[in-house]
């Protein structure tokens, strides 16, 4: 839906903002280009209009990022999720983003969105946002690029959905559904403190899940259990945890802020561990089938998120706490497995097994312009600029915009109840 596509879009479309590097000065931006119309789905429509408006090269097919339910229809613009955008550019320089963008929400489209549930994840439509956002967890992305994209992603309007009468009722940004699911209401402004500067990256984390969470708590300085929401192992009986593999091991970087009602005190950033981090980290995972199938990783992910949603509802968790915990749990690796003979060959997002299951390759919509053949690198460009220039298309020509009228770090983070398929 709206919020999810917005992500896919802006990653490459507008998603380059201010300087995030040690570069001393960046060139000035040129004049703003005209505003687009109020953009709306399907995703391809938003992307095409944004790239045309911003004068960005390249084409990407965004129609198959997430399979939709049979008979799914897109509602008219709604939920404060439609938006218009404009762009400006500046000369390329190492360490400086060449594009800048800003967005205005089309509040005239403020009726609550009514959307069909997704198979397996119900009203977790913001899974799309997370799927695209984690294209940036690739270990080969330069650090200043990762920081820049992260900053811009925080400017995206986040989706808030509830289930009502077997349908999803959704709103975006500063608005959330009321209890009856009949209208979008403005959230209370809790005046949350800003987050501290992020700490260092953790070691490469790995299963079992209980050990992983202990290390996360220690690294982030979190005490106690998260109100009964701490995940337990979901692995089938007798499941053998392999060595780190499949880009499924990862590092975390934490940011904290003052505890206050309505303000979740912690957020994390994630980076996959690859071949430079450990000898097997980038190798495809080879796992035994479970019940003669390779679908068990998906089943474990669904079980985890369904359990989380049930516990949150059972304990009547405030939406800002629920969304905050979901935002933390989203860092769990979710994988894609391919059946090869009597084994499962698995890799974790943003990677998937290649055709014969011998290696992990970047998913198509997470590839850079050069990787999809849309652009040739210039031999005389600095290495760091080559990477920076190519990564925009990584997060998929998706939807990454810089939002100047931004919602800030509001009390509510999107709840990515999600089909994380983890290997544990």
Swiss-Prot record:
Glycosylation site list: 291, 397
Protein's UniProt keywords contain Disulfide bond: no
Post-translational modification: Glycosylated.
Keywords from the named record: Glycoprotein, Iron, Metal-binding, Secreted, Signal, Zinc
Extent of Basic and acidic residues compositional bias: 372-390
Signal peptide (UniProt feature, chain positions): 1-17
Distribution of this protein across tissues and organs: Expressed in larval tissues like cuticle, hypodermis and muscle (at protein level). Note=Not excreted into striated muscle fibers or nurse cell.
GO molecular function: iron ion binding; zinc ion binding
UniProt main location, coarse: secreted
Chain's role: Binds iron and zinc. May bind nickel.
Domain of life of the native organism: Eukaryota
Subcellular location(s) of the protein: Secreted
GO cellular component, one term: extracellular region
Stretches for region Disordered: 372-424
Protein name: Poly-cysteine and histidine-tailed protein
